[in-house]
A protein has these predicted regions:
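Core nucleotide-handling region used for phosphoryl-transfer chemistry
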Residues: 1-339
């Protein structure tokens, strides 16, 4: 299964944008990355000579052979044919999950339910990349909380004293809302909310030779609609004109957007900053992390993140708290990179 592609900072990669590029701006979500694929997995080898088949079955994958024995096995393996079987595989950014025990969260049980969402739905060779947001199965926030008081009174007035990146999820998996009617003084109504949720941002197709083809964002959304899963919200789609200073997007407010200089990267950054700040459109009770700008017309996944100032402040606070409590020493590279 192909690894997660690191999303670099937009501000340091403005030169990546060229006139004529098609771009798409989506919401950057603060969660933990996960991927699930329905992929050809090597199950064994087949050789014509039945006598050698037993040797291949026993020693082909062994790492404890002597140099002479390894050479003998390698000679037999020259005419061996690989046997593949299609299997569902899940992982984090760079780790394939053999099981859902342990890990930074104590258990990856909350990941398992989302992996199973795709069973029976992915086509052979497809891999889906998604963000898991909300809370773990124990009710703990997937991502660290933020102390809003360090951002000033106005920020606290709007978002409260603490930021919890809930994205509409609930620690218990349900919540109660108080409803009134003419016949009743009021009643508590149980409303189901997920403890955690997923949002897809990338899909690929991998063949048996290991060649990977990137799905376009539109086709990714088509497949997600078929599977009944959500995608990251889209803010804008646009094309950079031949001079680099105009953004053309007839279906939204960016039509004819002009930057003072004819530089594609600077123009894209200015457009991205129209969307990267403010309340999160899903969570609404907390700020958004920022945006991701993807160059759609590239054969490989090419995207850059742009985070807003308030989120960066909250992230630094979370890092400081993790250092003070010693929690950062238990974090994997995946968790640290998400802070």
């Amino acid at each position: 299964m192909s690894e997660y592609c690191d999303t670099e900072q937009l501000a340091y990669n403005l030169s990546a944008f060229k006139p004529g590029d098609e771009i798409e701006i989506t919401l950057k979500m603060h969660g933990t990355s996960q991927r699930t694929g329905y992929l050809p997995m090597l199950k064994g080898w087949k050789v014509k000579n039945k006598f050698f088949q037993g040797i291949v079955n026993k020693y082909a994958s062994s790492s404890n052979l002597s140099t002479f024995a390894r050479k003998c096995v390698d000679i037999v393996m020259r005419d061996a044919t690989p046997i593949y079987d299609w299997s569902y595989v899940s992982g984090t950014r760079r780790t394939v999950l053999e099981n859902y025990d342990g890990g930074y969260y104590g258990s990856n049980e909350f990941r398992e339910q989302h992996s199973k969402t795709f069973e029976g739905k992915l086509w052979k060779g497809e891999t889906v990349y998604y963000e898991v947001v909300g809370f773990t199965h124990t009710g703990a926030p997937i991502m660290a909380e933020g102390n809003n008081e360090k951002l000033g009174k106005d920020f606290v007035k709007q978002y409260g004293k603490t930021t919890v990146f809930s994205y509409g999820c609930d620690p218990e998996g349900e919540s109660f809302k108080h409803e009134y009617s003419d016949c009743w003084d009021g009643m508590n109504v149980r409303e189901f909310k997920p403890q955690s949720d997923i949002y897809v941002y990338r899909m690929t197709m991998t063949n048996e030779d290991g060649n990977v083809v990137e799905y376009s964002p539109d086709f990714m959304r088509y497949r997600c609609e078929q599977m009944g899963v959500k995608c990251v919200p889209v803010f804008a789609k646009a094309t950079i004109d031949g001079e680099g200073g105009h953004i053309y997007a007839p279906d939204n407010e960016l039509y004819g957007f002009v930057h003072e200089t004819n530089n594609a990267g600077d123009t894209v950054k200015l457009v991205a900053e129209k969307y990267y700040d403010g309340p999160d459109p899903i969570g609404k009770t907390h700020i958004r992390e920022g945006v991701v700008v993807r160059i759609v017309n590239r054969p490989k996944f090419t995207a850059f993140k742009h985070k807003n100032f308030d989120f960066k402040v909250l992230s630094n606070i979370a890092i400081e708290q993790a250092i003070e409590t010693g929690a950062i020493g238990k974090m994997s590279d995946d968790e640290i990179s998400e802070l």
